[in-house]
């Protein structure tokens, strides 16, 4: 009996459950049918100064806070309304919003637009169109030149009228706040408040009741269908954004069927009117977004180059053009220090440096409490200007290892190597005192503005025919003089000629993902203010020296060796210093350095350590020069290539004509260059210390393991290497 009773009770309960489910489904179907026939959009009147923040159910318009768990854009008061709305078609348009990590916003799209007329004020427009839209702009501005303007408080009014036509099925995207998503139906109000350059635009989805809002209001009449409009965050940040103003009578082609007018006056009230047919869904907010200035961050906008400069360009021009009197002076040889004496003499007569040091601009601001190369050099120059000669550079040479780790007192070293170490040391000092940081700041110190220039490198893979080009920072030029080369012009012509990279010198092609035969060409992109040319007289294979005469001019025109010879900038350089290596056996293990210096009066002097002799220009031009220093007639403007991440930086060494030298390969960067970060703190040398074999060196600087890879200047440290640098194609 008990078993029968339990079985009957179970069947009775099952029947009751089925009966309740049938009743619920009947009621739900009845409600759905009733709502489909009876629900009509209502007109909402605006009044007062506030708006209700109550969210409305998308079906019955009852106040609620529950929203769709997937799309986050609609709200429901109960599961019945959610099921009903899902069956009506929400399942076709419901999708998860896309999250943009950079902007920290959700982007949602699934709305259609048709026939909307919107008038609202604006001072500028930025266009982001997706499809089938036509924008016509008529601007009345103070200038017709396209430019980028920054919206500022109380800016001058810009009069323009914009016509926007939008057809059906316009698919657009809009940002939705992660924290705020407000929906209203049947009524839209758009208000824009312009106070001190701020723009406030809020478009909301309104329900079937009265709402209030502060500021200027606009009425919209809606019939035959719901109007879906999402909540938009305030646009007060527009005063920090840049907007693009199109020139007069500009137009962009997009198709459409409704008009959007933007009056020029900021005080005009927005007027919104809309007529929609059955099945229409639109979002006025998305229309407005076509006319919103693009949001920009400080990281994405390039900051002013003047703000990033380490050294004032105006001060640099004054120092470069300043005629400071300094008579030639001698330096005492402290034991195999002729190489250092010759280099210090050349630096002492380099115009920007000499003016900077004589005026005492460094010592007044130097923060170093210990030994400082620039301070000691300044002290030496001030003594020379006082008429003392010869002078002892003991305070500089006693700290040679602080200038170059491999340098030491009493050792015979290479003059070019010491020049690079000295310039590197000065650069590190100026960087520590620089008010700015970054690659462009490194290139705009006093040293960077003085010696820095740019090369244009082009490489073509012979396998896939892929071409790449990149600008490279240069600090000096090392050119080969072997073979039939008899003049500086011929050496520069060979330097800028095509070279085949084959064998051990093959180029790593990023497209082929392997080492391939390639053709390479280097040209001068921007000439430096002080051009240092090193004639490679020392041979790495037999430790010999090329003692043949090389003709070099007093005035050097580098336009034939520039990547754009038709460019308006045709710099002419004047010779002002020459370093000569004298030897008896034509070897790099012995010899003596002397230098020739030209004063501001145009007089030439030969300086041999402590001895100073006046000479004629003809005598200088007949010498077997090792290093040539040329000064540009007028300083060049700040480089347009400075600080770019897509740019390679290197201290320059030359590309030789010989094909048997080993190159350092770098497969990750499609390059043969080394990677050394200048900002790492271990500034061994800004230049390559090994691409030219020392003429007076010991085993510390002349060993075969230290000889250069001549193709890209060996394994010298570079200013700032970008590991993720990408090649740029060119025609």
Swiss-Prot record:
Reaction equations catalysed: Thiol-dependent hydrolysis of ester, thioester, amide, peptide and isopeptide bonds formed by the C-terminal Gly of ubiquitin (a 76-residue protein attached to proteins as an intracellular targeting signal)
Top-level EC class as recorded in UniProt: hydrolase
Chain sites annotated for binding Zn(2+) 1: 57, 60, 77, 81
Composition bias type Low complexity, residue spans: 677-701
Bias-annotated ranges (Polar residues): 207-219, 265-281
Residues at the active site: 338, 592
Domain USP: 329-633
Gene3D superfamilies per record: 6.10.140.2220, Cysteine proteinases
Positions annotated to bind Zn(2+) 2: 68, 71, 90, 94
UniProt keyword annotation of Kinase present: no
Region annotated Disordered, chain positions: 171-219, 262-281, 637-702
Keyword Hydrolase among record annotations: yes
GO BP terms in the entry: protein deubiquitination; proteolysis
EC number: 3.4.19.12
The entry's keywords: Hydrolase, Metal-binding, Protease, Thiol protease, Ubl conjugation pathway, Zinc, Zinc-finger
GO molecular function, one term: cysteine-type deubiquitinase activity
Pfam families hit by this protein: UCH (PF00443), zf-MYND (PF01753)
Family matches, as InterPro entries: Papain-like_cys_pep_sf (IPR038765), Peptidase_C19 (IPR050164), Peptidase_C19_UCH (IPR001394), USP_CS (IPR018200), USP_dom (IPR028889), Znf_MYND (IPR002893)
MYND-type zinc-finger residues: 57-94
Family membership: Belongs to the peptidase C19 family.
Functional description taken from the UniProt entry: Recognizes and hydrolyzes the peptide bond at the C-terminal Gly of ubiquitin. Involved in the processing of poly-ubiquitin precursors as well as that of ubiquitinated proteins.
Entry protein name: Ubiquitin carboxyl-terminal hydrolase 17
């Amino acid at each position: 009996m008990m078993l029968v009773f339990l079985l009957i009770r179970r069947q009775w309960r099952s029947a009751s459950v089925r009966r309740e489910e049938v009743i619920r489904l009947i009621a739900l179907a009845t409600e759905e049918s009733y709502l489909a026939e009876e629900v009509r959009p209502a007109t909402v009147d605006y009044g007062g100064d506030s708006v209700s923040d109550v969210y409305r159910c998308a079906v019955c318009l009852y106040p609620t806070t529950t929203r769709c768990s997937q799309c986050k854009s609609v709200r429901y008061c109960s599961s019945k309304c959610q099921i009903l709305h899902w069956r009506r078609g929400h399942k076709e348009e419901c999708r998860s919003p896309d999250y943009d990590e950079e902007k920290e916003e959700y982007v949602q799209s699934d709305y259609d637009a048709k026939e909307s007329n919107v008038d609202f004020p604006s001072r500028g427009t930025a266009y982001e169109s997706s499809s089938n839209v036509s924008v016509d702009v008529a601007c009345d501005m103070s200038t017709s030149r396209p430019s980028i303007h920054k919206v500022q408080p109380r800016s001058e009014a810009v009069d323009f009228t914009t016509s926007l036509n939008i057809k059906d099925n316009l698919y657009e995207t809009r940002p939705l706040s992660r924290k705020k998503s407000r929906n209203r139906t049947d009524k839209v109000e758009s208000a824009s408040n312009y106070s001190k350059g701020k723009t406030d635009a809020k478009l909301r989805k309104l329900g079937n009741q009265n709402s209030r809002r502060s500021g200027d209001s606009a009425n919209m009449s809606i019939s035959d269908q719901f109007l879906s409009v999402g909540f938009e965050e305030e646009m007060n940040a527009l005063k920090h954004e840049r907007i693009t103003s199109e020139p007069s009578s500009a137009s962009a082609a997009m198709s459409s069927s409704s008009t959007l007018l933007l009056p020029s006056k900021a005080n005009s009230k927005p007027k919104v009117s809309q007529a929609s047919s059955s099945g229409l869904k639109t979002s006025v907010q998305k229309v407005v977004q076509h006319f919103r200035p693009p949001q920009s961050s400080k990281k994405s906008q390039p900051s002013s180059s003047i703000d990033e400069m380490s050294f004032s360009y105006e001060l640099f021009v004054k120092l470069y053009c300043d005629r400071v009197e300094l008579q030639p002076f001698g330096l005492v040889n402290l034991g195999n220090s002729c190489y250092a004496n010759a280099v210090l003499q050349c630096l002492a007569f380099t115009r920007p440096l000499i003016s900077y040091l004589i005026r005492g601009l460094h010592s007044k601001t130097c923060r170093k409490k210990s030994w400082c190369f620039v301070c000691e050099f300044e002290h030496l120059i001030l003594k020379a200007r006082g008429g003392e000669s010869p002078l002892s550079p003991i305070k500089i040479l006693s700290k040679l290892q602080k200038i170059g780790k491999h340098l030491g007192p009493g050792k015979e070293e290479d003059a070019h190597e010491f020049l690079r170490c000295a310039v590197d040391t000065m650069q590190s000092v100026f960087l520590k005192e620089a008010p700015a940081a970054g690659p462009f700041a490194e290139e705009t110190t006093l040293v960077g503005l003085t010696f820095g220039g740019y090369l244009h490198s082009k490489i073509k893979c012979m396998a896939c025919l892929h071409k790449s080009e990149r600008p490279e920072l240069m600090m000096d030029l090392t050119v080969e003089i072997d073979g039939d080369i008899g003049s500086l012009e011929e050496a520069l012509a060979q330097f800028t000629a095509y070279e085949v990279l084959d064998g051990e010198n093959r180029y790593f092609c990023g497209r082929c993902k392997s080492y391939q035969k390639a053709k390479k060409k280097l040209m001068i992109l921007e000439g430096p203010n002080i051009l240092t040319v090193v004639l490679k007289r020392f041979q790495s294979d037999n430790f010999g020296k090329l003692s043949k005469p090389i003709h070099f001019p007093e005035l050097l025109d580098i336009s034939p060796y520039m990547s754009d010879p038709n460019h308006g900038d045709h710099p002419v350089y004047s010779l002002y210093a020459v370093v000569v290596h004298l030897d008896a056996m034509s070897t790099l293990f012995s010899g003596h350095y002397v230098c020739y210096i030209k004063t501001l009066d145009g007089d030439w002097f030969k300086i041999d350590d402590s001895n100073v002799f006046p000479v004629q220009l003809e005598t200088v031009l007949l010498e077997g020069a090792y290093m040539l220093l040329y000064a540009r007639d007028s300083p060049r403007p700040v480089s347009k290539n400075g600080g770019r991440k897509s740019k390679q930086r290197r201290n320059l060494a030359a590309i030789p004509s010989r094909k048997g030298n080993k190159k350092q390969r770098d497969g990750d960067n499609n390059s043969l260059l080394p990677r050394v970060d200048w900002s790492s703190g271990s500034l061994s040398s800004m230049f390559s210390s090994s691409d030219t074999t020392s003429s007076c060196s010991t085993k510390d600087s002349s060993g075969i393991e230290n000889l250069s890879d001549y193709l890209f200047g060996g394994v010298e440290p570079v200013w700032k290497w970008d590991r993720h640098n990408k090649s740029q194609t060119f025609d």
